[in-house]
């Protein structure tokens, strides 16, 4: 793995097909319960098996295979530098082209991605599958916008991760289907860390229509 200072990389899954595929290329695998409701619960369960000697635990989810290593490095650095934050997650400022794509997806009834709004010091205010904030205008394709695309990668302090499964699913998490809202609904601080794509193509798997797009991007990058 290209991430600097990663002490250990583990694949957590409840599926033997994934376990077998991962073990075939030498990965360490932890089998978790089928009862995990989301990736954060799965990460918490896996961490409970591995011990508590780590300062930061990162959850890099399988639906974001194009996540570059510098996103993860920025999260870890941001969390370690901010003792008031319990979780860190990356955000990308949308240019007009990306914003238009999100808006077109929503008009078609699809979720193009999750957006985030945050206040002073990067403190998250809300995450939504709707496009927020409302802008009321159009932007040139390469113009920066006030909309930030949330990338579903998380860096946790172990104590915050450990308590997460004990909380019930809140109304906002249930409505949006966004696991990170459980932290906000329980008064924990989520740090949004702005990252840059550096010319790297990026997309997440949110809809079946995203599969060929991701496969094409991976082929262009030589990782398919």
Question: What is each stretch, according to the model?
Answer:
Residues 9-11, 57, 87-88, 124, ...:
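Hydrophobic/aromatic residues located in beta-strands of well-ordered beta-sheets
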């Amino acid at each position: 793995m290209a991430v600097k200072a990663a002490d250990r990389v583990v694949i957590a899954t409840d599926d033997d097909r994934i376990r077998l595929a991962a073990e075939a290329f030498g990965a360490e695998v932890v089998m978790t319960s089928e009862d995990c409701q989301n990736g954060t619960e799965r990460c918490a369960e896996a961490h409970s098996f591995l011990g508590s000697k780590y300062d930061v635990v990162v959850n890099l989810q399988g639906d974001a295979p194009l996540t570059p290593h510098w996103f993860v490095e920025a999260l870890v650095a941001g969390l370690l530098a901010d003792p008031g934050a319990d979780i860190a997650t990356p955000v990308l400022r949308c240019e007009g082209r990306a914003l238009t794509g999100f808006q077109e997806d929503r008009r078609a009834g699809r979720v193009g991605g999750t957006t985030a709004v945050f206040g002073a010091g990067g403190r998250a205010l809300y995450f939504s599958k709707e496009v927020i904030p409302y802008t009321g205008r159009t932007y040139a394709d390469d113009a920066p916008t006030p909309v930030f695309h949330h990338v579903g990668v998380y860096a946790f302090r172990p104590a915050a991760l450990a308590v997460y499964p004990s909380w019930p699913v809140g109304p906002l998490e249930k409505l949006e289907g966004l696991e990170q809202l459980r932290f906000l609904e329980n008064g924990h601080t989520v740090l949004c860390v702005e990252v840059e794509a550096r010319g790297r193509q990026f997309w997440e798997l949110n809809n079946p229509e995203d599969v060929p797009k991701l496969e094409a991007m991976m082929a262009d990058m030589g990782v398919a």
